[in-house]
Amino acid sequence: MPDIDALSRPRRLLVLSICCMSLLIVSLDVTALNVALPSLQRELGADVSGLQWTVDIYTVVLASFLLLSGSTADRVGRRRVFKTGLVLFVAGSLLCALAPSLGWLIAFRAFQAIGGSMLNPVAMSIITNTFRDPKELARAIGVWGGVVGISMALGPILGGALVASFGWRAIFWLNLPIGLAALLLTARYVPESCAAHPRRLDVVGQLLVIVLLGSLTFGIIEGGHDGWGSPLLLICFGIAIAALACLLWYEPRRREPLLELRFFRSAPFSGAFAIALAAFAGLGGFLFLNTLYLQNERGLGAFDAGLHLLPMAAMTLVFAPLSGYLVSHVGPRLPVLLSGVAITAGGVLLTGLTEDTSLAYLFTAYVTFGIGFGLVNAPITNTAVTGMPRSRSGVAAGIASTGRQVGSALGVAVVGTVLATGSRDTGWWVLAGCGVLVLVFGALTTGRWARRTAESAMARIAEEDAAEPARSAG
C-alpha cells in the first residue's frame, strides 16, 4: 500500500471518488426513504409514530456514534474503520430489505446506522489526509458538497421510481452493489492513515450521549402522543436532563473528552452548533411532512411525489456552491442571514397548503425553502472552525456534524408528534420557527464581537493545554 504523500494526482482523485461513493449511498438512503414512507405505512401497518422511528432511529444512532467513530479511526486506522463501516452499512441494508415487520425494520435501521457513522466523518478524514495542498483540498471538499446536492436532487426521484416499480424494499437493495463496489475499491486503492496523537476512548461520555439523545427523542415521539404533560414524556425529559448534567460535569474533567465543551466558549462555534440544530430540524421536518402531504393528501404516487420535491432539491444544489463563494469572499454572516430569511419564508408559505393548492404556489414554497437550506451548510462549517487551530478543526467540524444529525432527528420527532395530534398546520409553523432560529443565531454569532470571543477562547484553550503537561509532570 503506497504512502499518502507518494500518491499521484489520478490516485488521489480515485480515493476522492471512493469516499464520495459512501456519501452517495448514505445520502440517497436517507432522502429516498422519505418518499417511501406512505408505501411502508400501508404494507407494514405503521402509524405516524412508527414512521418517525423508521427515520429517527437511524439519525439518533448515527449522531450518537459519529464522534466515537472519528476518534476510533484516528486511533486504529481510517481505512480499517471505513471498510468496517461499509460492511456494516451493506449488511444493515440487506437486513432492512428483508425485514418482516416494522419492529424488525427499526432494529435493522439502528444496526445500519452504526455502519453509517463510520462512513462520512471517516471519509472526510481520509480526504483531508489525501489532499495536502490547500487548493486541491478546497476543490475536493467542493466535489464532496456537490455529491450531497446531487443526492438530494436524485434521492426523491430515484426513491419514487424504485417504490413505484418494485416497492419500498428496493431502496435498501440499491445500497448493496454500490456499497460492495466501494468496499472492494477501498481495499485496493485507499491507503491507511492514523492520527499522530489519537484521542483516548471516552466510554462514559459515549454512554451519556446515547442516553441523552435516546431519551429525548423517545420522549418526544412516544410521550408526545399522550400529551405534552404525559408521565412518559416527563420521565424521558428527566432522564435527558440528568444525562446532560452528568455530561457537563464529567467531560471537562477528562484530559481527552468525547465532547470538547471548551469550544462552546467561542460564540461562532456555539452559533454554528445551534444553527445546525435549527436548520436540519427544519429539513427533517420538511421532508417528513411533505412526503405525507403529497402522497396522502394530494393522492400522488411515490414517483410523482419525488418529482414534486425536485424544485427544492434543485435550489439546494444551485445555492450550496454560491454560499461557499459568499463565505470565502464576504464571510458567513450574509449567507446565514439570507438562509434564515428564506427558510422562515418557505415555512410560512407552507402553512397555506391544502389538497387543492396550485402547483405554482407549492413550487414557490419549495423553491424558497430550498434556497434557504442551500445557503446554510457552508456558514455552519465556516463558523464552527473560525479561529480554531488546524489540529482542532476536525474535532470542531465533527461536533457541528453531530448537531446536524441531532437536529434532523428532533425535527422529525417534533413535527411527527404534532402531526399525530391532528394539527398539520402547526408542523409547518415549526419549520418557520426553525428559520427564525437560524436568523437569530446567525445575527448574534457572526459579527465582530463573536469573532473576538473565538480568538480569546482559543487562546485560553491553548494556555490550558500548555499547562496540562506541566501539572502532569509535577
Question: What are the language-model segments listed below?
Answer:
Residues 10-13, 133, 189-207, 227-233, ...:
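Short loop segments and helix-boundary regions at transmembrane helix junctions
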Residues 4-12, 98, 198-200, 226, ...:
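Helix-boundary and loop/linker segments of multi-pass membrane transporters
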Residues 176-195, 210-222, 239-254, 438-448:
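C-terminal membrane-cytosol helix-exit motif in multi-pass small-molecule transporters
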Residues 1-11, 195, 445-474:
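Intrinsic disorder in cytosolic terminal tails and internal cytosolic loops
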Residues 191-207, 253-261, 451-462:
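Flexible cytoplasmic inter-helical loops of multi-pass small-molecule transporters
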Residues 49-53, 103-111, 166-174, 200-202, ...:
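Interfacial loop-to-helix junctions that mark the boundaries of transmembrane helices
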Residues 1-188, 320-323, 330-344, 348-355, ...:
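Transmembrane-helix bundle of Major Facilitator Superfamily
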